[in-house]
Amino acid sequence: MSISLIGVTTGPTGPTGATGATGATGATGATGSSSSVLGINTQTGTTYTLVIGDLNDLVTMSNAGAITLTLPPSVFSANDAINIAQIGAGQVTLAQGAGVTINSTGATATAPKLRAQYSSASIICTASNTFLVVGDIA
């Protein structure tokens, strides 16, 4: 059995409840200066000292003679990294600037060398004036 109501109208729609809080949205920080494009600094001499502009870039070294790459003091901060590559025949040896410590698995841990032409490595600053060298080193 069904019942039908004649003359019944629908009442007004009730008010909508309050919208729940979504929480404050934090401020957006400034855009960083990092780029996804790797810069290349080509060096052709027999000595080079890293500079802050080498940060997050690739320093290539190409010379027929031996090359000394110096890690200077008080330039880089913890978590900074620089990539290096030996393009020429001259073997690249890393040297500690005054007060700098280099750690590596190289035969001379504090003065590692790139193993051969086309070898590469990363230099990572792990603390003030302290660097870890990882890669194709001798």
Model-derived features with residue positions:
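Generic low-complexity segments that are intrinsically disordered, proline-rich and/or Lys/Arg-biased
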Residues: 13-16, 73, 97, 113
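Extended, Lys/Arg-rich, non-catalytic nucleic-acid recognition/anchoring regions
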Residues: 1
